[in-house]
From Swiss-Prot:
Organism (species): Mycoplasma mycoides subsp. mycoides SC (strain CCUG 32753 / NCTC 10114 / PG1)
Keyword annotations from UniProtKB, A to Z: Isomerase, tRNA processing
Name listed for the protein in its UniProt record: tRNA pseudouridine synthase A
InterPro entries per the UniProt record, alphabetical: PsdUridine_synth_cat_dom_sf, PsdUridine_synth_TruA, PsdUridine_synth_TruA_a/b_dom, PsdUridine_synth_TruA_C, TruA/RsuA/RluB/E/F_N
Active-site residues, Swiss-Prot/TrEMBL: 54 (nucleophile)
Reactions mediated catalytically: uridine(38/39/40) in tRNA = pseudouridine(38/39/40) in tRNA
Amino acid sequence: MKTGILLSLCYDGSNYHGWINQTNAISIQTTLNKAIKKVIKTGQFKTIGASKTDTNVHALDQKVLLIIYFTPILEKFIKAINKALPSDIKILDAKFVDPNFNIREVEYKIYHYYINDHQFDIFTNRYEYFWKHQKIDIIKLQEIFNLFIGEHEFKLFSGLKENEWNQYQTKRTIDDIKVLRINNKVVIQFKASGFIRYQIRIIIANCLNAYLNHKISTTKLVEMLQGIGKKTPFIIDAKGLVLQKIQFNKN
């Protein structure tokens, strides 16, 4: 009997090479699969993640569809898997779903990027980008990020190579971007149904450089959003990026 279980997962991505299985590196999915296999004593199962987070990216609400071939006592089953997992990965919640549940049918994903523009903190440094310049004017920075809200051509703001552009839908819509100040930290919130490889980190790096009037202008950003020109080399560290929430379509 095929059983589907929807897992809500949180993890510190610092020690992992992203979500997806890697041949020669340790990933979140590989580590989760290892823990599940230890509990059920078989390789007859499958995990599918809703978001392919990159190396050093963290998550508070990654969604994972687990397909197994028996019906467990859910609470005990999840407790056993959590016990087998390392301390930097944890299942927060689980529920039975149809095994054919489409985990890619996402209404929206919310990512947060954390910037410390106050005082260096060794205890939070692995979860944020330390800003070495003057305190950020969030109103000024918000005006730059507003250029990216809505439907645009994002191929020049992605990690895709030129020969990959035709393989992906690079014309995308970002529903909202908010620049917030929370507890002496700047939090940049992105909301969209999906993102291209490295898209958020490349957008942030370009906006911060435009904010500093460093090697790029807002005029150039507008042109790039039309697919005009070339990519810049700017990409911000992954460690400040957190997958905050995934919301599925209700129908």
